[in-house]
Amino acid sequence: MVQRLTYRRRLSYRTTSNATKIVKTPGGRLVYQYIGKTGKVPRCGECGVNLAGIPALRPYQYKNLPKSRRTVSRAYGGSKCAKCVRNRIVRAFLIEEQKTAKIVFKKQQKDLKQKKDKKSSK
């Protein structure tokens, strides 16, 4: 005759949080063992691609990991992918370049105008 099994916890429905597998103990009994939920891989905040170098765990398991395993040692390490960080840095650089170019252009225009005024006054 087959041994009957009962859940060890109060939840009696077959939900994802109540997933079990049958295991035979050293004493020969069959018991339910609870399986934890599988974690999701963290994703990039901008483009949504999976972040490389960070394990897929449940949120409460990340607190037990050392910081070197939780993040990547780079700017925006655990939240943005390398491609998005590169784009952000390049964009910031180009914006700064544009600002300085604008200032230089204004100065050149001002100098040119002053030279014209000097020539016309003579």
UniProtKB/Swiss-Prot annotation:
One of its GO terms (molecular function) is structural constituent of ribosome. Pfam families: Ribosomal_L34e. Transmembrane segments: none annotated. GO terms for biological process: ribosome biogenesis; translation. Keywords: Ribonucleoprotein, Ribosomal protein. It comes from the Eukaryota. One of its GO terms (cellular component) is cytosolic large ribosomal subunit. InterPro entries: Ribosomal_eL34, Ribosomal_eL34_C_sf. Belongs to the eukaryotic ribosomal protein eL34 family. This is Large ribosomal subunit protein eL34. The gene is rpl34.
